[in-house]
Amino acid sequence: MAEIQFSKGLKEPVVPDIRLSRTKTGEKGSAEFYFKQPTILGDQQTEEITGMYLIDEEGEIVTTKVKGKFINGKPMAIEATVIFNSPAEWDRFMRFMERYGSENGLEFTKSS
């Protein structure tokens, strides 16, 4: 079980686009998530976005770097960023992504 939440206890079913970057030394990196029309922004939702929680059997990875995108005053997307300050944090994130990706049909593709 690997899932993403924006409010504790409320799974986000929309699968995001994810872009990864890492320094040449591998010491630091980041993951940028883009959710187009996530359910947390739907008309029926009343839950507050408190961060982005990546949850699996190892625990959770949390970021508060979460922004909403609005078009003509209507919420359309969420962008979130996770920062990695060590190779161990990167490795932990990649283990989460392997689980999340296999459950949601995501594939890892290196850029050219």
Swiss-Prot record:
Pfam (any one): Psb28
Location, primary (coarse class): membrane
Gene Ontology CC: one annotated term: plasma membrane-derived thylakoid membrane
Gene3D superfamilies, sorted: Photosystem II Psb28
Keywords: Membrane, Photosynthesis, Photosystem II, Thylakoid
Membrane-protein topology: Peripheral membrane protein
GO biological process, one term: photosynthesis
Family assignment from sequence similarity: Belongs to the Psb28 family.
Record's protein name: Photosystem II reaction center Psb28 protein
